[in-house]
Amino acid sequence: NKKVNLEQFRKSILYPLHEDGFDPYREEFNSMMDSNLEAGENNFSAIKLISFGKSDQTPKLAYRSLSQIGEYFKSGLSEIEASFNLLTGEERANHLADMLRGENHLPFTYQDLVRSGQTTKHFIAPPSLSFKHKNHIEIDNRLLQVVYVRDYGMELGDKFIRDLIQSDLEVMMSLHAKGSAKSEAMKKLRTKKTLMESQKIGEQQKMARSGVYLEKVSQVLESNIDEADELLKTMTQTGDKLFDTLFLIGVFADTEDQLNQSLDIVKQVAGSNDLIIDNLTYMQEAAFNSLLPFGKNYLEGVSRSLLTSNIAVNSPWTSVDIQDKGGKFYGINQISSNIITIDRGKLNTPSGLILGTSGSGKGM
């Protein structure tokens, strides 16, 4: 979720004046769009990427598996009319440069790489990166702090991602999910459950020697045993798999005060969605690498096991904004409050039909 140059966006959608007698209408239209820009969320642009990783015996087999996974995702998410494009190497490099350097970089091409004799890292990496602070990173003259979702509520939904995107914060979110074979996951769960039950019996025997007889011991231990039971039951009945999951949030700011204020907003949004955010103290470098869309998690010991259904609902595709570059104003997205701009000249059939109730503004 990155900031866009609002003035450039205005210039791309407002009607230029031509002094041909129709300028009052253009000015009225421009004034209406200007007020919608101020009321909407067009000062931020959300870019959504999916990265897949696959280990196999040979690169050829791994590439074949990746292609199958990509087509599977594309087919599944097409049901909610979310369109996908496979990124080229140049496009991936430019997206990474946008994330790390903002607008302060030239467009990357492989021809430039050949001429310069440099690597893609020279085009992507910012002039300076400092990891000397325990809780944040310095990127040029800006700050970035990476935090993670430590605890999840009983019910998960897509509202947290939607609220965070609409909170007027410059953030990067990364959701890692690494699956395992169902039989292996259930075996591990049963082993953990057995160990916890053995621990429970041990504590009961210890209390019995002291003359205390209780059916239940530690509340946390009892809760963990019940949770393991529920997971096994759900996996057996629904066919869900278990995934090692890590939800990271990177917050950008210009000063430490702004960073703290932004983090407070993130924690408030998380709290309203029954989630708990925690810092990654002295782990910012590994967290930074995990935040980038490489499809690899470099952090250890902070992941959480979630079921397929829990992960599937965390979708960033809650609405689709139609904003063609150089397009004209066609209304307001009722979900995101962003304006809709369409360049009908790019369509196979640029003709259109305007429908609406009486007095709804069809004449405009």
Locate predicted features.
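Glycine-rich phosphate-binding loop of nucleotide-binding enzymes
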Residues: 325-364
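Pre-P-loop entry segment of helicase/translocase ATPase cores
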Residues: 303-332, 336
